Amino acid sequence: DMTPRHLAEAAKRAGRKAGFRVKILDERAIKKLGMGGVLGVAKGSAEKPRFIILEYLKGAKAQKPLVLVGKGVTFDTGGLNLKPEHGIYEMHMDMSGGAAVIHGMAAIARLKLPINLVGLIPAVENMPSGSSYRPGDVLKTMSGKTIEVLNTDAEGRVILSDALYYGTKYKPGLMIDFATLTGAAHVALGNYASALFYNREKLAPKLVEVGRRSGDYVWPLPLWDEYLPEIKGTFGDLANIGKGDRYGGAIHGAKFL
C-alpha cells in the first residue's frame, strides 16, 4: 500500500539508517512554491502530494552537487485517459525512479563518499475522479512555463518539470533524472535496457559503460531539436504529448523535460 505519504516515510527511514538528511514538503508548501505540475496531477486523488528532498553534503563547499531526480507516481491509473486493463495492474511500480534515487542516496551515504548529492522526488497518485486534471487543462509550472495537457496519462514529465526546475536552485554540476518514462521507450528497447537521453556528449559513453558493467543497461536515443515543434502547445508553452501521431513518444517526453 504505497502512497505519496508512505513513500515520504520510507525516505525518512532510509535517511535515518544511512545518514542523509530528509525534508518533506506537504501540499501547502508545494502550492507556495508554485509547482502547478505536481498539484495538477495530484488533483484527482484523495492522497495528497509530497515533495521529497534528500541531502547528503559531504564534499567540499566549492564542489557543485550532483542532483538526482526520481519520478514518484505511487500509482498511475492514467487519470481520465484511463490505462487499458492489461497495463494497469503493475502501475504501483511507477515510482521506481523515486525508489532508485532513495536507494542510490542510501548506498552513497553508507559508503561515506566525499561528494555533495541531492535527491528530489515529486510524489503523487494519478487517479480519475470528479476533481482530476483534464485533457485541455493548462498548468503553470514552477518555472513559469505553461503545459497544455493533451493526455492525462503523460503525467510523469509534468511532475518532473517542477522537480527539475527546483533542482536548479542548487546550481548543480550535473542533474540526472530517473523515470518510468515512457511506454514508448519500452517498445523501442524491450525488457533489457533503459532509454538514455542526454545533453552532454562526453557523459553518454560513460553512462553506457557503467550500465554494461552493472548489468543495468542503458542505450542512447536522440534529443534533436527537430522534435521540438511536435510538442509546442497551442494554448500553453508546451504540450505534454507529441501532436499529430504516436511516433517518437519517448523522445517527446525527454524533449519536453
Provide a role label for each language-model segment:
Residues 1-7:
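Short beta-strand to alpha-helix junction loop
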